[in-house]
From Swiss-Prot:
Keywords: Fatty acid biosynthesis, Fatty acid metabolism, Lipid biosynthesis, Lipid metabolism, NAD, Oxidoreductase. The lineage of its organism: Bacteria, Pseudomonadati, Pseudomonadota, Betaproteobacteria, Burkholderiales. NAD(+) binds at residues 48-53, 74-75, 111-112, 139-140, 244, 273-275. It comes from Burkholderia ambifaria (strain MC40-6). The keyword NAD applies. Pfam families: Eno-Rase_FAD_bd, Eno-Rase_NADH_b, Enoyl_reductase. Gene3D superfamilies: NAD(P)-binding Rossmann-like Domain. Monomer. One of its GO terms (molecular function) is trans-2-enoyl-CoA reductase (NADH) activity. The gene is fabV. This is Enoyl-[acyl-carrier-protein] reductase [NADH]. One of its GO terms (biological process) is fatty acid biosynthetic process.
Amino acid sequence: MIIKPRVRGFICVTTHPVGCEANVKEQIDYVTSHGPIANGPKKVLVIGASTGYGLAARISAAFGSGADTLGVFFERAGGETKPGTAGWYNSAAFEKFAAEKGRYARSINGDAFSDKVKQVTIDTIKQDLGKVDLVVYSLAAPRRTHPKTGETISSTLKPVGKAVTFRGLDTDKEVIREVSLEPATQEEIDGTVAVMGGEDWQMWIDALDEAGVLADGAKTTAFTYLGEQITHDIYWNGSIGEAKKDLDKKVLSIRDKLAAHGGDARVSVLKAVVTQASSAIPMMPLYLSLLFKVMKEQGTHEGCIEQVYGLLKDSLYGATPHVDEEGRLRADYKELDPQVQGKVVAMWDKVTNENLYEMTDFAGYKTEFLRLFGFEIAGVDYDADVNPDVKIPGIIDTTV
């Protein structure tokens, strides 16, 4: 079939398998052209491995450090008449390129929050890898079925303590509009912490540790975003921020557990990028469009692969890691440069419907968004007939 982008709100409901493969190849080429990660990991588990930062971590480990990788994700395969999810195609492409290099790469499809998927993962590590020396936690999900209670909990994107009104960009209509959000209830805050906080990360590490599949010296990291003042009301000081603060609490006991075997646990702070998760946050498209313009002008613009490759090379496995006073690894320092933030803030209220394209890099934002789904990739013929039914050989599918 010939597949074209069809966007509804903050999701593109079509995906392009050849485009997704080309996008993965571009990221692999970036890593291989920037040289190996010294003393990097060799057997890696990535939880949330199919898109965005998790995929970038899997690529960086495999192609920057020669690592065998096991990826966990929740994606949908394509059929003869309907495309699958971008994450499915990304993972199929990743495994294909890893196999060409003779690297072990296997994937588990299912609900990473569940005990079942944790057990299947442990069994697979024991059978195929023995032990893992890096666990990357990169889940972004709107809801979670708690494995102990069976309750399905939802996360909420709201401010805490007060209603907030802010400027946003309606990406469908391409207009600036005011967005007002009422404060989250305590129940909504608790739900967001349960879905996006550190409990599941801790459950994963506890399960892996009890099963004896963490190597001596094993490290783990979970990805987070802090942002600057302009996004704080909705993000760091909002319900999502409460979940992110929970990561900072949970990491302490995880670190103690791993330190007993010479290992370490860190929260890693990454910059704002276009992902399926960030495009759903009301003020992020406008913020990202301004941020891209400023950072591209300064020559400091980065996407997922640049961020995560740099994180592994410089901080997780580097001699002089970028660490803040909270003990977090920081890869967002270029975004938070006062000059960059100052320019973004100065332009924030000046953007109008009329000057949107000249004042911001909304065009670049739209391109990045479509690239998530395999569109707008250089060298791909989007008028060609493609087969959406792409197999992942050896996948362990717990959803069937």
